[in-house]
């Protein structure tokens, strides 16, 4: 699934902007502070949230445009529109209307084509196929300290959309999932020493590709429970990595995790499809990594 066109009108500080014929692999939005980069990503997240909602229920609603999102001073409605590479388009809008006594707002959506797309995705998943990953990593994404006691995470294909577009990315769910999958893998290895979990292999492949010096990420049980990773020849706790290392590593591993959840039918889940939105992709990164990350992300 790929985005072809985006049209945004009267959304926050944006009066009218169109992104036409977007690159199918990678699009970088560059601008000075206050230019509207985050607003563009937030608008796209609102639009994609309706697709996720309609996968769950035919009458479900996605994120709404708040009255505060309508451009100040505009008498025209706020309009967000998206078109995919398969010519499927949908629109979410909100306008201000006035009465004599008070001000009211009205909303309008055009979701007919998107509803059909949502139903196709659900039907494909029910036949054992995969679903597209839709994910937004906002600038507020954080790497919370890895909890000492991780809870087992029961996973199904629709968990790929948990907190996907809400802006609440703290990566805790990644560590819980990794612990759960590693437990399953360890149980299988007792019967078959050559067994490796294909979803964990997807994460390991990403780590080796992005971080050649990193390997063997695992949950250490003794002397106390902690997520550890081998950096060079030294095994260190995840919490001891630099903020840039933690942020970068968690980002690419979480993308790989979601691809694995979304594509249980693929031998290589990294061949799955989706739309990933990342605000300030170079956040906390060393200048060398800042120069590399955009190109490397296209390899996932």
Language-model-derived ranges and their functions:
Residues 1-59, 224-300:
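Switch/communication elements of ASCE P-loop NTPase nucleotide-binding domains
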């Amino acid at each position: 699934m790929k985005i072809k066109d985006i049209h945004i009108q009267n959304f926050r500080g944006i009066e009218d902007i169109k992104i036409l014929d977007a690159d199918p692999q990678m699009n970088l939005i560059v601008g000075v502070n206050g230019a509207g980069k985050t607003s563009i990503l937030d608008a796209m997240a609102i639009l994609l949230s309706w697709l996720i909602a309609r996968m769950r229920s035919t009458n479900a609603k996605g994120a709404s445009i708040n009255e505060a999102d309508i451009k100040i001073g505009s008498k025209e409605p706020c309009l967000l529109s998206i078109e995919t590479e398969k010519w499927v388009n949908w629109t979410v809008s909100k306008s201000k209307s006035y009465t004599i006594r008070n001000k009211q707002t009205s909303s309008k959506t055009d979701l007919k084509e998107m509803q059909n797309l949502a139903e196709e995705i659900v039907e494909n998943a029910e036949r054992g196929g995969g679903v597209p990953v839709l994910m937004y990593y906002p600038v507020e994404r954080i790497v919370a300290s890895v909890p000492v006691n991780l809870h087992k995470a029961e996973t199904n294909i629709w968990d790929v959309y948990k907190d996907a577009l809400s802006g609440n990315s703290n990566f805790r769910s990644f560590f819980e999932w990794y612990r759960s999958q590693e437990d399953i893998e360890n149980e299988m290895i007792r019967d078959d020493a050559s067994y490796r979990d294909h979803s964990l292999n997807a994460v390991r492949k990403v780590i080796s590709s992005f971080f050649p010096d990193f390997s063997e990420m695992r949950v250490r049980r003794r002397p106390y429970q902690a997520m550890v990773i081998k950096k060079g020849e030294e095994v260190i706790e995840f919490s001891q990595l630099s903020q840039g290392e933690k942020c970068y590593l968690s980002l690419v591993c979480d993308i790989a995790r979601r691809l694995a959840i979304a594509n249980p039918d693929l031998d290589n889940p990294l061949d799955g499809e989706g739309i990933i939105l990342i605000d300030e992709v170079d956040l906390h990164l060393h200048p060398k990594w800042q120069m590399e990350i955009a190109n490397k992300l296209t390899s996932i």
